[in-house]
Amino acid sequence: MATYLIGDVHGCYDELIALLQQVEFMPDTDTLWLTGDLVARGPGSLDVLRYVKSLGNSVRLVLGNHDLHLLAVFAGISRNKPKDRLTPLLEAPDADELLNWLRRQPLLQVDEEKKLVMAHAGITPQWDLQTAKECARDVEAVLSSDSYPFFLDAMYGDMPNNWSPELSGLARLRFITNAFTRMRYCFPNGQLDMYSKASPENAPAPLKPWFAIPGPVSEAYSIAFGHWASLEGKGTPEGIYALDTGCCWGGELTCLRWEDKQYFVQPSNRQMDMGEGEAVNA
């Protein structure tokens, strides 16, 4: 009865299956946690969604920014970009079923017994766990409702970037979405910076990675997250697990077995094209 946490899959279906075979994942007894961004960039987004959906209660996942963008494309709000390689999924006969399932997935996973929290980008230090839970439920309720296209149309944007319980309406939902799915850096007071994507050693002052700023959740729980592939799984404090290691860019797909904290990796089937900065089929 093992718990396996895997970083951003990004449509890398073959690597996902190979990694699960490597760890001898047994859906009947084991549980798979996925950090979000199941889709886009890799060649197998359709197969990834079909497989993950088939796991039923054996999987616990959170939505990432690429998953939300896919839903916006599906709703006719955003453009389908060729580099995301989503057309086979969008044109599949079961696309409606898969994407209506996807939009009903959570933004936050919490296991009180393990003292483990998972969100795609992390947990802003401005929130305690109760606030994070309430905020996740706010967005999840809209995404699972018939009015979800209205929300998806309004979710794009970088403001507001400072949490306040007084935030309401679409501004509140946009902040929550950015905090759960796009966050990397914060100012010392926890205010989000939505612009810098530099590696931590090159980040402009006074910005710090969100996990370098003490917060109520990180003080009491372990946090698993994805989203930030350039970290390469390194440089986080004890109890903070960065699991996106850039499989879709030619890196690796990383798995953490929770019970003994052992890591497993599956090399990408793609190799980095340094001229374009994009991974290509190997």
Swiss-Prot record:
This is Bis(5'-nucleosyl)-tetraphosphatase, symmetrical. InterPro entries: ApaH, Calcineurin-like_PHP_ApaH, Metallo-depent_PP-like. Hydrolyzes diadenosine 5',5'''-P1,P4-tetraphosphate to yield ADP. The gene is apaH. One of its GO terms (molecular function) is bis(5'-nucleosyl)-tetraphosphatase (symmetrical) activity. Keywords: Hydrolase. It catalyses: P(1),P(4)-bis(5'-adenosyl) tetraphosphate + H2O = 2 ADP + 2 H(+). Its EC number is 3.6.1.41. It is an enzyme of class 3 (hydrolase). The keyword Iron does not apply. The keyword ATP-binding does not apply. Belongs to the Ap4A hydrolase family. It comes from the Bacteria.
